[in-house]
Swiss-Prot record:
Keywords: ANK repeat, Membrane, Repeat, Transmembrane, Transmembrane helix. It holds the Pfam family Ank_2. It is found in: Membrane. GO terms for cellular component: membrane. This is Ankyrin repeat domain-containing protein 46. The chain crosses the membrane at residues 195-215. It comes from the Eukaryota. Signal peptide: none annotated. Its main location: membrane. SUPFAM superfamilies: Ankyrin repeat. PROSITE patterns: ANK_REP_REGION (PS50297), ANK_REPEAT (PS50088). InterPro entries: Ankyrin_rpt, Ankyrin_rpt-contain_sf. The lineage of its organism: Eukaryota, Metazoa, Chordata, Craniata, Vertebrata. ANK repeats lie at residues 11-40, 44-73, 77-103, 107-138.
Length: 228
């Protein structure tokens, strides 16, 4: 299970990156105005945008963007600045400037997956979940016409009304959704083939227990005893 947490490195010999770590807006601005590369990287491939976003320094993120920082830059593990975010305002800034909320790193993890692993606060998790839902629906891509958006909203409203009239259905859908999310995270963390192997082992154990209890091998027909 691999993920990045940038608080493990608070020192660098690159002045601009150190200013981003320290949250020193004025020094960052002077360095950029003097010609420092806004996309300079540390030993892990992280830019100043990665480091500032990870610490919630949205003002420095905006400053770097103004001086030409690449919002799509990834570190050596494929993480964008959004993968390292743990603050609402930095997430909103990056997404509003075109960064995809469902982008995956080299391990296939989205910003939401990494945020959950790091244990960031619930407001951030809820925001990332909401943005992912909107991305799936297409609202963040700008591909829907006003008519399509209205139709989608009406459909969701009708479904919500139906759920309110049927509380048992609403509760059941909530449990199913929670189970589905937990199962997806379990498969992502463990890996598909390991999950498949685990299921196979459990099946063998079940057959062994059944044989131990009943003395009869499952799926094997009992042969009639010969009477001499």
């Amino acid at each position: 299970m691999s993920y990045v947490f940038v608080n493990d490195s608070s020192q660098t010999n690159v002045p601009l990156l150190q200013a981003c770590i320290d949250g020193d807006f004025n020094y960052s601005k002077r360095l950029l105005e003097s010609g420092f590369d806004p996309n300079i990287r540390d030993s892990r491939g992280r830019t100043g945008l990665h480091l500032a976003a990870a610490r919630g320094n949205v003002d420095i993120c905006q400053l770097l963007h103004k001086f030409g920082a690449d919002l799509l830059a990834t570190d050596y593990q494929g993480n964008t600045a959004l993968h390292l975010c743990g603050h609402v305002d930095t997430i909103q800034f990056l997404v509003s400037n075109g960064l995809k909320i469902d982008i995956c790193n080299h391990q296939g993890a989205t910003p939401l997956v990494l945020a959950k692993r790091r244990g960031v606060n619930k407001d951030v998790i809820r925001l990332l979940e909401f943005l992912e839902e909107q991305e799936v629906k297409g609202f963040n891509r700008g591909t829907h016409s006003k008519l399509e958006t209205m139709q989608t909203a009406e459909s969701e409203s009708a479904m919500e009304s139906h759920s309110l009239l049927n509380p048992n259905l609403q509760q059941g859908e909530g449990v199913l959704s929670s189970f589905r999310t937990t199962w997806q995270e379990f498969v992502e963390d463990l890996g598909f083939w390991r999950v498949l192997l685990l299921i196979f082992v459990i099946a063998l154990l079940s057959l062994g227990i059944a044989y131990y209890v009943s003395g009869v091998l499952p799926f094997v027909e009992n042969q009639p005893e010969l009477v001499h």
